[in-house]
Amino acid sequence: MHSNGTMLLLYALASIIILILMIAKWRLNPFVSLILVSIGMGAVTGMPLTKVLSAFQDGLGSGIGSTASVIALGTMLGKILAESGGAERIATTTIKIFGPKLIHWAMLVIAFIVGIPIFYQVGFILLIPLVFTLGRASGISLVKLTIPLCAGLATVHGLLPPHPGSMQCVEMLHADVGKTILYGFIVGFPAAILAGPLYGNWITPRIQLPAHNPFAESLEGSSDQDKNLPGFWLTIFSILLPVLLMVFSSGANIFLPHGNNIRAFMNFMGDPVVSLLIALLVSMVTLGFWRGFSSADLLKFTNDCLGPTAGILLLIGAGGGFSEILYRAGVSNAMADLSHVMHLSPIMLGFIIAAVIRVATGSQTVAMSMSGGMLAPIIFSTPGFHSPELLVLSIGAGSSILSHVNDGAFWLLKEYLNMTVSQTFKTWTVSVTIASIAALILTFGLQALGL
């Protein structure tokens, strides 16, 4: 690799270390820290300062993008579920079915199922109110409940179509969608078990969360706990409605041709913002008006819960700005070049390339799409390689590794659980890395079986 590429990697590493020190040791505001490090990274790599600022703003806008709408609508839906008693109904029923000792396993199963058709952030925002309610009702640590939730959602996001990164890899590598989904389940669920309930059990006693959690408190119901709670299935329907709409949209893309009006309509209905909006409006009726709440009550609920979301939106946006600076500076290409010169099997090479791009950019989707494009001409010329589905899985596994401060999901978990940066590394970063390595090992296992 050229010396320029080596210097880029050193600059990127230094910027990440400085960012961590700013936030964790020097206690500087994370949003301000991300701006300063982004400007510094752009300057030392030779970008004109005006272009540094425009790149950061572009990344910030793209980082927030529809995420702002998703977080706002999902938070409103969670608040209505809490105020109506719906979240409490799910919590009490879940505790009754699984028992307090198995609730964290239930969260993994729920996350794995719900996460199939939706983005990680959407699933997290949709299910985190349930985590808060279950934690309050059972007395179990939020860490023990949230780690399985995050592991399930993140694993599905990286390994299973119809998520955009894996779908792009399937198309570029000419893999079979059905086989990829089947192998993805075989690889993904055991990996999520290791990274979720098992690692969560180990790390929970080592993480002490603050007693005050503004997000949990903003989603607490204010009415009497002895009230008549809504039905379990009605509440489940309110949570799963956006998921069902997204599933129908994915099905339409598979079974209906381009240009079909029904497909276009289902794609519109299955958009995360539209599906959450529909679910919110339905819940306002079924869990709001039907249960005696007035329009003024619903307005108060939906306004009061939005305050704590401002900080996380800024951090997600700033993380996107930092990622854009790294991308435009050429860091991801330098990391890919470093991996490319190593003489490795396609599966190992796919894992490494996706991993280094993920670490550089903070995006699973970008890591998978770039890796698939780079590896397609290689595997087509590699004699004896007949497992593009396994290559898709290895790329997905690599794209999950070492999520850190340039990933919006890192800040999402940190803020919602009110953790420190150090605690977020110990929980989120380690968990997704365990899932990543486990998925790679299991992928090699499938290859050894001749699949």
From Swiss-Prot:
The protein's matches in Pfam families, at most eight in alphabetical order, are given as: GntP_permease
Q: Which GO terms describe its cellular component?
A: plasma membrane
Listed as disulfide-bonded, the cysteine pairs are none
What keywords does the record list, in alphabetical order? Cell membrane, Gluconate utilization, Membrane, Sugar transport, Transmembrane, Transmembrane helix, Transport
Chain ranges passing through the membrane: 4-24, 30-50, 62-82, 108-128, 140-160, 180-200, 229-249, 270-290, 306-326, 337-357, 375-395, 430-450
This protein's membrane topology, according to the annotation, is: Multi-pass membrane protein
Its UniProt pathway annotation is: Carbohydrate acid metabolism; D-gluconate degradation
Which GO biological process categories is it annotated with? D-gluconate metabolic process
Q: Where in the cell is it found?
A: Cell membrane
Name the NCBIfam families for this protein.
gntP
Per its record, how is this protein called by name? Answer: Gluconate permease
By which gene is this protein encoded? Answer: gntP
